[in-house]
């Protein structure tokens, strides 16, 4: 143990010893939050994440306290800003490529599939002429929480902003059904 500490103090230890860690908790009024991190110091990151939860009216919980409210899915987004994708043809192509479900919304087509198949499904759809915007694994909530209290809405927005601004945070997943007229951007 002392050799490792001396080596680290002398600058000889690996400088890029990063590890994945996941923190779970609740935001204001019980909004479920999962925070995926990549850190070189788990204790520092845990303290920072706990601080954000506490500061903005939530609390960090134990592992597994909210992950049962989410399902890991492959999510592929296709560009449909021009509205030129035919829904019937898209359904046929998506199912043929291996997609499970899809929906048209706000200038995009969002497809869900098994997370291990997302890249393959996206590649197949790209070959068929669809413009793939993204294809990644996401934690998709099974239920959503709506906040009606203005203070809760403000605190939830600030919590998400603080988490996303942290350099160690890779992804933030939540089940907040955020209001449409979001002025954060």
Q: In which residue ranges do the predicted regions lie?
A:
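A generic local secondary-structure boundary/capping motif
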Residues: 21-25, 160
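RNA pseudouridine synthases
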Residues: 24-38, 43-76
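Structural motif
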Residues: 16-20, 31, 80
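Conserved small/polar residues in nucleotide/adenosyl-binding loops
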Residues: 1-5
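Active-site phosphate-binding and catalytic loops of NTP-dependent enzymes
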Residues: 11-20, 58-63
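Positively charged, low-complexity, intrinsically disordered RNA-binding extensions
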Residues: 75-185
